[in-house]
From Swiss-Prot:
Catalysed conversion reaction: 2 nitric oxide + NADPH + 2 O2 = 2 nitrate + NADP(+) + H(+); 2 nitric oxide + NADH + 2 O2 = 2 nitrate + NAD(+) + H(+)
Gene Ontology biological process terms from the UniProt entry: cellular response to nitrosative stress; nitric oxide catabolic process; response to toxic substance
Record's protein name: Flavohemoprotein
Binding site for FAD: Y188, R204, Q205, Y206, S207, F394, F395, G396, P397
Chain segments carrying region Reductase: 147-402
PANTHER family associated with the record: FLAVOHEMOPROTEIN
Originating organism: Bacillus anthracis
Annotated site residue numbers, Involved in heme-bound ligand stabilization and O-O bond activation: Y29
Top-tier EC class: oxidoreductase
Amino acid sequence: MLSEKTIEIVKSTVPLLQEKGVEITTRFYEILFSEHPELLNIFNHTNQKKGRQQQALANAVYAAATYIDNLEAIIPVVKQIGHKHRSLGIKAEHYPIVGTCLLRAIKEVAGAPDEVLNAWGEAYGVIADAFISIEAEMYEEAAHKEGGWKDFRNFVVVKKVKESDVITSLYLKPEDGGKVSSFIPGQYVTVQINIEGETYTHNRQYSLSDAPGKEYYRISVKKEKGVDTPDGKVSNYLHDHVKEGDMLPVSAPAGDFVLNMDSTLPVVLISGGVGITPMMSMLNTLIEQDSKRNVCFVHAAINSNTHAMKEHVEAVDNEYEQVKAYTCYSAPTEKDLEMKNFDKEGFVEREWLQTIIPTTEAEFYFCGPVPFMKHINAVLTDLGVKQEHIHYEFFGPAASLQ
């Protein structure tokens, strides 16, 4: 329990964190990786280079300071981060290391006096305990489910399917021949990739792109441009070098962006690009479980060359009366224009979306590039969709949609 004095001091640093938060977290990661380079085997190097991880941590620290007198308010955020930590294999022993480096960064960047550092040290201990407790429960739950496991388990690539010019699916089965644990549609796994010549392991989260209940997991990976970029290095490796029969270490499924199976409301699934992957899991689950809920499936792509799972979604649309699928191409090819194999040219605009969604009284799920997500969030809010019915997933550290 934090004292009133400690709470007062921590809350007094909110303006400082608003101004210098990213500077502090940037320095924090510099200290962390210089003194503990082994942690580069856990953290995503791409998000470090792009500054997304620094921004996400700054947002989390700012929220912690703001709600230090009511930490219950940030438990949903703690759980969201906890899912990511569990999937990466972050353990209780990592927290003291992080705390020490964070306090050093606050002192170096902000010149914080001992009184402030002591208060933050005390507050960090309470926050870390919350993370450790929640993540311990997550580890236990993942390990004790039927077909479950702790940390990483070796999976074999049993099938590799090209879904479009830029997206390829990998079908993964456990090397030990055992079962795979079930998951909730929308969840992801962490895949460990060891690239020859690379000093550190690369960890990447990929949404599971098929319904649960199979003997395999399916992930569908976008090939990023440029093998010299961190993103490109990993995705190009999976596309060009990983073959059927190869082995990949995989974490148990995690994540809180999940289909609400208890709701009876219609479902609207909106995706841009590779954001289609968790939506495929949700769509396939709804039809395989013979759900009677109306489903509106909206996908935005550049054109048919980059449009993954197009034939499958069209087949579902044709077979199931309750499913309506719509496609938006920003730059259709001549063949697309000739065949008229899409519904709208351009972008997913408010006026068009309003004409195709069955009702605003529905559960809305969306995923895609951050600018796309910001736009969809603004449109849904403007249309009066209730906040509790708006669900979204970032591919990478959480950002603001405002």
